[in-house]
Amino acid sequence: MKLQINLCALALLLMISFTAMAQSKTKAKAKAKKEVAIQLYSVRDILNKVDNKDGKCDAAYITLLKNLAKMGYTSVEAANYNNGKFYDRTPDQFKKDVESAGLKVLSSHCTRGLSKEELASGDFSSSLQWWDQCIADHKAAGMSYIVAPWMDVPKTLKELDTYCAYLQ
């Protein structure tokens, strides 16, 4: 009888342990969601057709963002920073648009090459001012990163030296 009680107690402990393990695995699976961002440059053909000018917000633009979220994307990288705006939306508007679609703003890729005058003179202060505004706008849009996707190829060693100083 004592053996039977011990075996029953052992079986009960094993059942409780396995049940707890199964529940913790189920909770872990439910919590696990991959973070996957999409570079909006990859859907530029669609975005180039939207009309967000004059402060209005094109329905096709919002639909695209919502569809990206439905596909499983969790964040976006912008690729259209121009005159202080992203896709003709102010940084605050862009952030609200993206977040209302269920996505996060992660990053942007943009750059500013040096003009011929800047390369010749070595004075790139106007480009640095542009970057100051660019960084402020990206922060306002909620971005954590800015990627420079390309750089003009310098034609001379002097131009290369100027670019090196500029990029520092």
What are these regions (language model features)?
Residues 12, 152-159:
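Generic structural signal for short, solvent-exposed loop/turn connectors between secondary structure elements
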Residues 168:
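Histidine/acidic residue-rich metal-binding segments in metalloenzymes
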Residues 1-29:
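Bacterial Sec-dependent N-terminal signal peptides
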Residues 18-141, 158, 162-165:
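N-terminal pre-domain/capping segments
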Residues 138-155:
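Hydrophobic alpha-helical segments and helix pairs
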